[in-house]
Amino acid sequence: MDDNDDGLMLNFAAPAAGSASVSSKRSKQTAKARFAQKRTAHQLRKQAPKQNRSVAPIESVQGVVTPASARLSPAPASANESPAAKRQRIEATSTSSAALSAPRFDPRSETAKSAPITSRSSQTTSSAASSSRKAIAPVTKLAGSSFASAGASSSASKQTNGGIVSTLFPAHGVLEDSSIALTPFQRKAYHPTNAPSVGSDFASCGLDPLLVYHLASKMNIGSNPTAIQKAALPHLLHPGLDRDILIQAQTGSGKTLTYLLPIVQSLLPLCEESFIDRSVGTLAIVLAPTRELARQIYEVLEKLVSLALSLKEQNQEVEGTVRRTRWLVPGLLSGGSTKNHEKQRLRKGCPILVSTPGRLLDHLQNTSSFDVGKCRWLVLDEADRLLEMGFEEQLTGIVRALDGRRNLACTAARQAMPAYQEGTAPGDADWIPDADVMDTLGMAWWAHARRVVLCSATLDEHVQVLAGKTLVNPKIIRGVKSDAAETSTQVTTDADSTLQKRAVKFAAPAQLAQSFVTTPPKLRLVTLLSLLRSYISRARRQWQHVDHQAGAGRVIVFMSCTDSVDFHYAAFGGARMNASENDASADVQVQDAQLATHVTSELIPDVPIYRLHGSMTQQERISSLKGFSGIRTKHSAERQGFQGSILLCTSVASRGLDLPEVGCVIQLDPPTEGGIEEYLHRVGRTARVGRAGESWLLVLPQELGWVEHVLESHMTIQSSDSASCSCSEIESKKQGSTRKITPASIELVLQQGMGGTMGTLEYQSRATEVQLAFERWVISGERPSLLARKAFLSHVRAYATHSAEEKQYFNVRALHLGHLAKAFALREAPRSLGAKSSAIGASSTPASSHETTNKKRMRIAPDTAESDSSSDSSDDAGSDYESHSNKKGDAFELDKAALAKLTESIVANADGSNRSKKLAREAQKAAAAAGVADDKAKQTDAEARMYAKVRALGKMSKKHGVLGAHAADEFQIA
């Protein structure tokens, strides 16, 4: 794909001022010449005799050691030379002079492994110099190169001030097997499985005409329910069915409206009574695991209760229209807001309340004006996430508090009735049952038991235990779409249905196109940028020529930790293609980016980039979500035309959020918690309610087994004809052409994202220049360098938190830390990063603890004065991407002593004392006493810190003292 076609131009001008730019025609010829010359040089290395490879090197014009083989005459034609190779040899011979004077940096040349040459006046050496690799110095300092390292710490390497500049691509230019690159996978097309049912409408489900009209005219939802709505609404709307409901449906199928519509309709008759207002108290409570999901439900509820209360307001003349009063006011309780303001709203009355568990329990215990004695509805949304985040104790306390308040209110109303006689007890003839108790207004609030609705996309054993504690005689409802648009309600009661539940448990929408890219750790950054550029380009063309809504161009990128989000957010906004390494404005740009709601990138023009993670304030979260969703603000009102945007986030945005028109989800890091369930929740942010979507997963070569043996084996895709299939038929669809996750070629991804002439390696040169732009930004100031180092260390710590079942695929010891550092635009060896990690920890500690931290740093004595440059050159040469970190004495191994001191200071400063260390030792002793330490005696530092942190937070299970940690802030998983 050419740059002129993708609509996203990259400025590949050299940082230093040079001569006039070369014409596009000459650039294309140069790219072809480089491609042909590289292939010819590769054949020369194979055909050259052994004695020719040890020719003494000669000094080149630029002072770079160049082997004599670089000046060899064109190779003679061999006997078995193919026609294609012959054409390449002839073309390379005729254009060798043009190739040698190419102004663009060639990342595959041998001298480029040390430092790239970008000066217009300098000549690039021939790629045939790679035949004498051993004779070349591993790292060469070029004084005249504008890409030379400067301004960074000198402890990383002796050869350059800024570190080691290594190439991204192998010398032969081939990244993967030709079978993957040339045979793209053809995925079978499916009809949407979570789209609204065509053969039914909301009116047939028993919904009030006011709500039917409001959904179609004001909320633009239409009149057709989804499969789960069609299955659940009749049970929730029927006045005689008071059973609790457990709703399970795939993500993006409309579960929020499934429980909000019955709540609003059940309260509409009360609006006909003129003596009832909002002071009646809270009648319905909805619990959500995160602040973002709670606010989203609140916003949907606000739109829902703003419906017209009579048909006359709809310009329809109907006799006998009942007059209703508007007192259904929703309320929101969540962390990050002022409790005094919330108490004022509760004192006035909030009939429908949306809250997070912790804040609701706080008000139940401390707010006396909080009236929940008449509560009729309790909804637990995303129940599996509530349990994973450790809210089980809060949920139990909430249910007990609601039961106690209900009994107190009912007893007080009974005693206030004229027919009440003191001394009576249940069973006596004069005893007034709960169904007959009325308040002073004559309302029988306690005639029906409180209904509990539990919603979840997955039903694991923990959710079933919670359902047993909170639900009474529950009914499990699943919406399954068939050819005839029929829905089925299933209750799991036997072994056969358990198998069916397992098949539906990990179901992805059929219209979601899932792909994965096997990415070497060096190429993670440029591959992410290529995916973003290619999708934005496709969405922009689709918006211009096909559909203005289908190509919205909104992308969500999931990462493993908050430091990684902050680094990529600042790097995309600060990297410039023509910037210098000593740009003094880099620190100011990073500081401005941290304060701004969004940033824009020169690499992805006219597309705002937002971020979202758990360490942001509530106001920053709200601003990011509103900006990404395209809600009209001062900035978005000025934007015209294409409304694409990018959201960089952690797993905090993976559950329940219905962000509008998200067309693509990219997972830079596989989920560290939850496994396949978390993966499905992430990809469920797109392809919602029948819309198309695509998802991309970046995996390292050693992580391919997780895709093949976990995702492919345990995930199903429900097609429109799978409702009538048995479980064995559904499982058999993963074979052959119905593979669920498509392997994609990294070469094609880079080609589409970076552009350039098809059939050449020009995209590799462009990707290298983009990588160098990020590296120049990192070494240009202290703040960018600090962000990159923190992101690298946090990523390694987060990688170590994968569950024991996934350690065979995600083993931190199998990481090539040197190549991984390249993904964070670092030129320093990870050993030196480990030594600098104490400074990172000190920058995040309070001022009162600086002295203690400095004393701890003085005790760290890593051997960082010398670095093994030969090991750097051999391991980081770019010729192979296998992991070498299993070898002892690897130069790219983290300084464990420095990291241990860093983590000790982090844990110690978390609670201001050394209590966490004692708790860590107690946790290890408790685990050893329970028999856990027999098989897992060698716990990682991350696991020990997680035990200590969870102990400090007071979140522990009751199984022999062994702890279960979820979303610990130290590890920045959420």
Swiss-Prot record:
EC number: 3.6.4.13
Domain Helicase C-terminal: 531-747
Coiled coil: none
PROSITE patterns tied to this protein: DEAD_ATP_HELICASE, HELICASE_ATP_BIND_1, HELICASE_CTER, Q_MOTIF
InterPro entries: DEAD/DEAH_box_helicase_dom, Helicase_ATP-bd, Helicase_C-like, P-loop_NTPase, RNA-helicase_DEAD-box_CS, SPB4-like_CTE
Residue intervals of the Helicase ATP-binding domain: 236-477
Keywords for this protein: ATP-binding, Helicase, Hydrolase, Nucleotide-binding, Nucleus, Ribosome biogenesis, RNA-binding, rRNA processing
A GO term, aspect molecular function: RNA helicase activity
Entry-linked SUPFAM superfamilies: P-loop containing nucleoside triphosphate hydrolases
Primary subcellular site in the record, as a coarse category: nucleus
Reaction equations catalysed: ATP + H2O = ADP + phosphate + H(+)
Function: ATP-binding RNA helicase involved in the biogenesis of 60S ribosomal subunits and is required for the normal formation of 25S and 5.8S rRNAs.
Family, as annotated: Belongs to the DEAD box helicase family. DDX31/DBP7 subfamily.
PANTHER family: RNA HELICASE
Protein name according to UniProt: ATP-dependent RNA helicase DBP7
Organism: Mycosarcoma maydis
Gene name in the database record: DBP7
